[in-house]
UniProtKB/Swiss-Prot annotation:
It comes from Shewanella baltica (strain OS155 / ATCC BAA-1091). It is found in: Cytoplasm. Keywords: Cytoplasm, Initiation factor, Protein biosynthesis, RNA-binding, rRNA-binding. The gene is infA. Residues 1-72 form the S1-like domain. Component of the 30S ribosomal translation pre-initiation complex which assembles on the 30S ribosome in the order IF-2 and IF-3, IF-1 and N-formylmethionyl-tRNA(fMet); mRNA recruitment can occur at any time during PIC assembly. It comes from the Bacteria. The keyword Transmembrane does not apply. GO terms for molecular function: ribosome binding; rRNA binding; translation initiation factor activity. One of its GO terms (cellular component) is cytosol. This is Translation initiation factor IF-1. Coiled coil: none annotated. One of the essential components for the initiation of protein synthesis. Stabilizes the binding of IF-2 and IF-3 on the 30S subunit to which N-formylmethionyl-tRNA(fMet) subsequently binds. Helps modulate mRNA selection, yielding the 30S pre-initiation complex (PIC). Upon addition of the 50S ribosomal subunit IF-1, IF-2 and IF-3 are released leaving the mature 70S translation initiation complex. The keyword Lipid metabolism does not apply. Belongs to the IF-1 family.
């Protein structure tokens, strides 16, 4: 899959789930399940409830995503 196919949206962490999964509420009100991208995992980026994040979604499954950035 090409990088251009991903949809990037802003959201807020609602809940922390097992296995570094998170429930994220997007700006448009949808709630998705997201995991941390590999680079964030490698650099030990901590994500807590209430953090503002950028989530990448694929057009094929809009209920799952990947967290690629945590705002300060």
């Amino acid at each position: 899959m090409a990088k251009e196919d991903n949809i990037e949206m802003q959201g807020t962490i609602l809940e922390t789930l097992p296995n570094t999964m998170f429930r994220v509420e997007l700006e448009n009100g949808h709630v998705v399940i997201a995991h941390i991208s590999g680079k964030m995992r490698k650099n030990y980026i901590r994500i807590l409830t209430g953090d503002k994040v950028t989530v990448q979604l694929t057009p094929y499954d809009l209920t799952k995503g990947r967290i690629v950035f945590r705002a300060r």
